[in-house]
Amino acid sequence: MTALFQQLPSVDKILKTSQGLQLITEFGHTAVVATCRELLTQARQFIKKNNQLPEYFSNFDRTFVEIHSRLQKQNQVQIKAVHNLTGTVLHTNLGRALWSEAAQQAALSVMQKNVSLEYDLDKGKRSHRDNYISELLCKLTGAEAACIVNNNAAAVLLMLATFAQGKEVIISRGELIEIGGAFRIPDIMEQAGCYLVEVGTTNRTHLKDYRNAITENTAFLMKVHSSNYQICGFTSSVSEEELAELGREMNVPVVTDLGSGALIDLSQYGLPKESTVQEKVAQGVGLVSFSGDKLLGGVQAGIIVGKKEWIEQLQAHPLKRALRCDKVILAGLEATLRLYLNPEKLTEKLPTLYLLTQPLKQLKINAMRLKERLESRLNSQFDIQIEASQAQIGSGSQPMERIPSVAVTIAEKTNVKLSALSARFKQLSQPIIGRMENGKIWLDLRSLAAIETLLNTLDEL
């Protein structure tokens, strides 16, 4: 075993070779030294365990191939582009909404230049970074003003911290939601320093329940969109319009966490109906919060629209600065919102809406091409079929609704396991992410952004 240890080169010897000098030129001295030390440590452990040299130390060329490979991997960004074939268009784990071309160009432009982020070009003095988008949102929603933060949970936190600290917030028991990552509405309220007052029951809440709970310490009445679940059967709830009327009568503000935040009626495209921001504003809700990267189809942001005097108080709260968005997000959001000024072109310009409205005929064509490519690459190892599928919007939007789709399914036919194929899919330069269902891999075309790129990726199999 001692002889094996002696065969290992020193770090200095590796660095002084021509290959070592090339590595230093490409990756830098510090990174190369660290990788060499790591490799040698692992080699010593391997020798102790197996009483032989690892393969990559069998000759110098293989050693340098291994070092180069590790250094390349270290330099790669770990957030990788993937092919979404899960059938969930707004997949939280895969980054939710794809940015439009307009949003990408706007973001790239502000990355490369100094911009008028907080500067009024007409007046020649400082302005507020939310101003551009606030004007646009008012035009689109009918609200008086708007406030932008980094996500919808932050929007809810800011509203609670600004108006309800040390006070009571009345909410229906059926709306005490938990979203992904065990993040709960009651927890946000606790962080904001307000007191939760639950009214009604899980399945039935009436207007009188809110009325009876109002006290002099009530900050506001709150509605929360139950985006990731539905209560069915013997149910009753109070609409925002009814609640707003009660709020005006009792001089208590009403706020709504709308969650997904649609700016258009999706039913016009044959999709499930979702409440729009405009509807809530028109119903008299004082503040409406929603996400920028769900049904809106843009960047991750929390958007609050509503009455000007309340928005001004949100903007003045110290927490707003901690939650504000940078120039890239604001540019991407503005560009996304401007697409809504021409709604007739939305299905062409907005990737989320394009994916959700793709005709089945096109999905079938894409499925046939995908099936042919898989069959040519997998050499009859699996049973590959085209089947009808049921896709979903995702990110908590209409959780019980499904959208007709088409999928390529892969089932075992030989001794090659699906788990092995799934692992191979994930090792590709742009990994393929499908779903396992009924003993098959389902590759759902509804959520796929680029068929040509996928087919090229499959050539690596």
UniProtKB/Swiss-Prot annotation:
Its EC number is 2.9.1.1. It is an enzyme of class 2 (transferase). Its cofactor is pyridoxal 5'-phosphate. One of its GO terms (biological process) is conversion of seryl-tRNAsec to selenocys-tRNAsec. Keywords: Cytoplasm, Protein biosynthesis, Pyridoxal phosphate, Selenium, Transferase. It catalyses: L-seryl-tRNA(Sec) + selenophosphate + H(+) = L-selenocysteinyl-tRNA(Sec) + phosphate. InterPro entries: PyrdxlP-dep_Trfase, PyrdxlP-dep_Trfase_major, SelA-like, SelA_trans, SelA_trans_N_dom. The modification N6-(pyridoxal phosphate)lysine is found at K294. The keyword Protein biosynthesis applies. GO terms for cellular component: cytoplasm. It is found in: Cytoplasm. Belongs to the SelA family. This is L-seryl-tRNA(Sec) selenium transferase. It comes from Haemophilus influenzae (strain 86-028NP). The gene is selA.
